[in-house]
A protein has these predicted regions:
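A beta-strand edge to alpha-helix "cap/lid" segment located at domain peripheries
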Residues: 2-24, 73-169
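A solvent-exposed, acidic/Ser-Thr-rich amphipathic alpha-helical stretch
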Residues: 27-31, 45-99
Length: 169
């Protein structure tokens, strides 16, 4: 089994902290997940990238990338294609500096076809709370517009909106 120090030291900007910091307890891990959901729902690639180490390594589906610049480029492409993106994340498990989440997001393409994308992510954080490793597996399901479950205005999910488990997803 890999230890929490399974990767080499990561490069971060001096003094750059992203609380809550590891090691995570249930409350800290749940806060970290909601903060990640909120920033991804901003659909601002540069803002999202600040939560990752300078040399963060990602696997997103079958695409591999490394570093904040690559993250910004990837997210710019993603949100050019995935329109009206709305995301909900849910804590699945945590241990020390690692968090596992499940998520679902809804979006439409430029032809008007709606999708719900389901996935799981494994995250590993450095001591400053920046994510240094992200592994995401995602599947897209075409849905009818009438089957959408996420109808809040674009941006942060309202606090009173149901989560994944509450929605039966």
């Amino acid at each position: 089994m890999a230890t929490t120090n399974s990767r080499a030291a990561t490069r971060t900007t001096t003094g750059e902290l992203r609380p809550p910091l590891p090691p995570y307890d249930r409350d800290g891990a749940a806060r970290k997940v909601r903060l990640a959901e909120d920033v991804w729902n901003s659909r601002d690639p540069a803002k999202v990238a600040t939560g990752y180490t300078l040399d963060s390594v990602w696997r997103n589906r079958a695409e591999f990338l490394s570093g904040r610049d690559a993250i910004v480029q990837f997210l710019t492409r993603k949100w050019t294609r995935e329109l009206e993106y709305r995301l909900i994340k849910e804590l699945w498990a945590f241990h020390e500096n690692r968090i596992a989440v499940r998520f679902a997001y809804e979006w439409r393409d430029d032809s008007g076809q709606w999708f719900r994308s389901y996935g799981n992510e494994n995250w590993e954080f450095d001591a400053s709370g920046l994510m240094r490793w992200r592994i995401a597996s995602i599947n897209d399901l075409p849905i009818r517009e009438a089957d959408r479950r996420y109808r809040w205005p674009l941006g942060r999910r309202p606090d009173d909106h149901p989560g994944l488990s509450d929605l039966g997803l």
